[in-house]
Amino acid sequence: MSHPMSQSQPATVKHDTLFTTPLDKAARFSFDEQVVACFPDMIRRSVPGYGQVLAMLPIFARRHCKYRQQGDNGQRVSRIYDLGCSLGAASMTLAGEFESQDLQIKAIDISPAMTTEATTLLSDNYPEHDIEVITADIRDIEFEPCDMVILNLTLQFLPAADRVAVLEKIYAALSEGGILVLTEKTHAFDEQYDAWLVERYYDFKRANGYTEMEISGKRNALENVLITDTLDEHHTRLAQVGFQRHLTWFQFLNFVSIVAFK
C-alpha cells in the first residue's frame, strides 16, 4: 500500500506560510486558492494521525462495501461518499487499493478551489475509476444508497444546528452493514484535560515548524468557523440519528475518528 499522503499532492506543493505575518483579527479562515496551494503541507503539519486514518479506509471498505449497487455496465459496484473531500485524499487512497470496476465514489466539497484541484488530481492519477467530484454544500445533497460515507474533518465546519440533519440523511442512505467514518477535532469536557490536550497539540505544531504567530493567527482565523464537540456529544448524536453501534477506533491528542455501523 502506498502512503496515502503521497498521492494527494498538487503539481507544486507550497509550504504553509499563510499565518507568518499578522492578519486582520476579523479575517476568517476559508478554503480558498491560497489554502489549496499549501493544503497538503498544512494537513501534514497540523493534523496528527491524518495519514493513519486515510490508510485504514480501504481496510474498512473491504469489510463493509458489498458491491450491492448495479453499475451501468451490469457489474456490481459499491458506492462511497467522500464528504468534504478537499483535494480528494480519501478518494485517492480508496482508488489506489480497489479495481476501477469495484467502486463508485462521489467526492463532494463546497469549495470550488478545492474541487477544481481535486478533479485534476483524481483524473490524472485514476482516470479509469468512477469518481465524480461535485461542488456542493453537503447539507443540500440527496444521497443515493451507499455502503460507506467518509466525513473527515468536515462536520466541525457546519453550524451545530445542522449536524443532526446531515447525519440523519447519511444514516438513511447507508445500506445495512454499511459504515460512516467520522473524523473530527474535539474538545474535552473537563477543562483541565482540555487545556492539556490543546497545549500538547500546539507542541505538536511547534515540533512541525509552526511559530507562535502562526499558531495564534490560525487559531484566531478559525474562531467561530471550526466549532468542536466533545467525544460524548458525537456519540450521543450518532445514537440520536439511529446508529446503534459506534466506537472510537482512533485518537491522537484531540483528534478522533469514529466508525458507526448501520
From Swiss-Prot:
Classification via InterPro entries: CmoA (IPR005271), Methyltransf_25 (IPR041698), SAM-dependent_MTases_sf (IPR029063)
One Pfam family per UniProt: Methyltransf_25
UniProt entry keywords in alphabetical sequence: S-adenosyl-L-methionine, Transferase
Gene3D superfamilies reported for this sequence: Vaccinia Virus protein VP39
GO MF annotation: an example: carboxyl- or carbamoyltransferase activity
Coiled coil: none
Enzyme class: transferase
Reactions listed under catalytic activity: prephenate + S-adenosyl-L-methionine = carboxy-S-adenosyl-L-methionine + 3-phenylpyruvate + H2O
BP GO terms, sorted: tRNA wobble uridine modification
EC number from the UniProt entry: 2.1.3.-
Binding site for S-adenosyl-L-methionine: 50, 84-86, 137-138, 152, 219
Assembly information from the UniProt record: Homodimer.
Protein name: Carboxy-S-adenosyl-L-methionine synthase
Species assigned in the record: Psychrobacter arcticus (strain DSM 17307 / VKM B-2377 / 273-4)
